[in-house]
């Protein structure tokens, strides 16, 4: 086996080496020595773990993103030591896996001795003002989440990092390092390629590992996928794909591999926006047509106002304050029957990751607008209450999937500290967020009839969007031409 050094960069807002990071490092340790570099201080338990399984552990100031981490690691190791390795791997925590035996990938690439450096996947060329610099053009490149450098280019590799400047933003990191690394060394005459062959997808997707991760894992032998698949902003995802990539990836990992994907999701939940994860993973279920033999335990307003402990193996029903107006009318109509509540409670048995369930948002368009307005009004109070409970969570502009009116069903195990006093509207927003902090998801449910109607509502919304699109494009061209004429007249 080749002598390899794996420089693994990790960052976690709470200073942890989480479950997915540990799994990746332990698997990679079978194919090389691991130099673990962390942006920011590690928590004591995570530091002890890293020191126990890695060759070297470096904790550095949280500056410069991945560029700063790689640079400090390379410079600390030094050129003389780097030259003792056949390959140096740059890898970071944004990848999850491996799925399967990672040694098989290295064995395949060992059969490509003509390459001077190689990567896992590539990003294809695209126009981008955000990442493309002055020319607004991103070249085709190896993605920086996994790059392997061989010994014959090690001197130039070391010089590259000696000269590397620390980026001040994520955009700078991509623009000045990730999109330039491949071209820089190719211009010096070094040959490169990627392990995963996606040439046939280049005309469809600029970023295949995000657009079709399940395809790359199942059919292309790719041993890794992006954590971000599960929390990327869903509106962005819909501009690129049909929005099903993350759910397909999860189902594949859960049913056809041994990868502990639920451990990854439990690690992501406390540090990523709940709404984005719920949308990407489609945490929405149709009520099972069962007898509903396990009715949830009803918690009345007096009990909720005082706060209460919960039995971990029990399911509880929390009635929400009644809303006013036409929205309140539709919320009241969406309140499940006793049978539907019992059927919904059975969903907890089928989905161990779910800690909170509630009725889906009514189809009346005003309910969605009213929920978004209420969330913006209540978010500061919710954030303050989370801080008082010592539960720091990222709150997004998009509201959490619940509450939607009517009631909430909660799994007792999702609230080991019990429920805090719940009286005001901002209090009830805490329920899905506290479950999230404890590593549990929130999901919505509805009857099959409402789900069928939802498809028609979606069709109507998409038709309206298509009608508006040409108008906005015309407005855009008009503004662009006006700005061009103003610029020309100023010369």
Please describe what each predicted stretch is.
Residues 1-491:
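ER/Golgi luminal nucleotide-sugar-dependent glycosyltransferases, focusing on the catalytic module
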């Amino acid at each position: 086996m080749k002598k390899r050094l794996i420089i693994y960069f990790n960052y976690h807002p709470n200073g942890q080496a989480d479950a997915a990071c540990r799994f990746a490092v332990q698997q990679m340790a079978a194919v090389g020595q691991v130099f673990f570099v962390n942006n920011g201080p590690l928590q004591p338990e995570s530091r002890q773990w890293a020191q126990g399984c890695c060759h070297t552990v470096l904790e550095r100031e949280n500056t410069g993103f991945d560029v700063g981490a790689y640079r400090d690691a390379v410079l600390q190791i030094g050129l003389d030591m780097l030259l003792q390795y056949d390959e140096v791997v740059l890898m970071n925590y944004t990848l999850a896996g491996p799925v399967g035996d990672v040694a098989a990938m290295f064995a395949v690439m060992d059969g490509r001795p003509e390459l001077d450096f190689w990567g896992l996947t590539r990003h294809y060329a695209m126009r981008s003002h955000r990442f493309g610099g002055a020319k607004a053009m991103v070249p085709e490149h190896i993605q920086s989440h996994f790059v392997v450098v061989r010994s014959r280019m090690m001197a130039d590799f070391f010089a590259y990092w000696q000269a590397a400047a620390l980026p001040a933003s994520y955009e700078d990191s991509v623009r000045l390092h990730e999109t330039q690394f491949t071209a820089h060394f190719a211009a010096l005459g070094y040959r490169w390629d990627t392990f995963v062959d996606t040439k046939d997808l280049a005309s469809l997707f600029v970023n295949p590992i995000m657009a079709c991760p399940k395809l790359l894992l199942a059919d292309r032998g790719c041993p890794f996928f992006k954590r971000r698949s599960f929390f990327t902003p869903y509106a962005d995802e819909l501009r690129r794909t049909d929005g099903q990539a993350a759910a397909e990836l999860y189902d594949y990992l859960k049913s056809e591999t041994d990868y502990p994907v639920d451990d990854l999701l439990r690690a992501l939940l406390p540090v990523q926006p709940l709404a984005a994860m719920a949308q990407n993973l489609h945490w929405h279920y149709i009520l099972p047509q069962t007898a509903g033999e396990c009715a949830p335990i009803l918690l009345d307003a007096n009990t909720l106002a005082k706060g209460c402990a919960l039995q971990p193996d029990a399911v509880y029903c929390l009635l929400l304050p009644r809303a006013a107006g036409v929205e309140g009318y539709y919320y009241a109509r969406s309140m499940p029957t006793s049978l539907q509540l019992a059927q919904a409670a059975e969903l907890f048995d089928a989905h161990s990751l779910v800690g909170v369930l509630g009725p889906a948002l009514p189809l009346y368009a005003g309910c969605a607008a009213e929920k978004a307005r209420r969330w913006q009004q209540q978010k500061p109070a919710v954030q303050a209450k989370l801080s008082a409970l010592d539960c720091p969570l990222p709150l997004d502009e998009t509201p959490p999937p619940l509450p939607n009116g009517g009631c909430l069903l909660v799994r007792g195990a999702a609230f080991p500290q019990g429920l805090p006093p719940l009286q005001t509207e901002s209090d009830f927003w805490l329920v899905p967020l506290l479950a999230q902090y404890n590593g549990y998801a929130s999901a919505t449910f509805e009857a099959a009839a409402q789900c069928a109607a939802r498809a028609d509502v979606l069709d109507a919304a998409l038709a309206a969007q298509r009608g508006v699109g040409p108008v906005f494009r015309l407005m855009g061209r008009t503004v662009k031409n006006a700005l061009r004429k103003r610029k020309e007249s100023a010369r």
